């Protein structure tokens, strides 16, 4: 809810014409770059919450999630190490009826936007490779992350250490994940 309570957003919202849902979507689609962090974390947290819900919940929120993340891509595509691309990689692997290659395309964009951020590769393995039942690529990608030095890029070090541990956990679960 942080972005919805932001003064800058509320000013934009109040100047928009239409019913409440249309106003929110319109205001989000025109949000300025200053709102990128608030929008990113709001929608990212919303997705992680929705991932534990039935697929219909993700479908019901699809328009909102896509509008916000496409706005972020238009303003700051590399925000949080290609986070909007990574978001779509995860999201499109979890929406029924969406071609799984859309997930792959977005994960590849996330990785190319910041190859040093391990989360892009680990989430690609966890969501895309698992969904597409590509165990060899899953194993290779996770092992590559484990073999990297997480301390080289100090600004990413805490998250890279986390994702190395996540990669190890996923490798330990491979038999369950690929039954």
Features from the language model and the residues they span:
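Amphipathic alpha-helical repeat scaffolds of TPR domains
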Residues: 5-15, 31-52, 78-93, 118-128, ...
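Alpha-helical adaptor scaffolds
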Residues: 77-113
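Short coil/turn connectors between adjacent alpha-helices in alpha-solenoid helical repeat scaffolds
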Residues: 49-61, 93-102, 131-139, 176-179
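Structural signature of alpha-solenoid helical repeat scaffolds
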Residues: 30, 35, 57, 76-77, ...
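Terminal, low-structured helical/coil segments at or just beyond the last alpha-helical repeat
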Residues: 141, 147, 151-179
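Conserved structural position within tetratricopeptide repeats
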Residues: 5, 73-74, 108-112, 147
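TPR/TPR-like (Sel1-like) alpha-helical repeat modules
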Residues: 1-3, 104-105, 129, 136-152
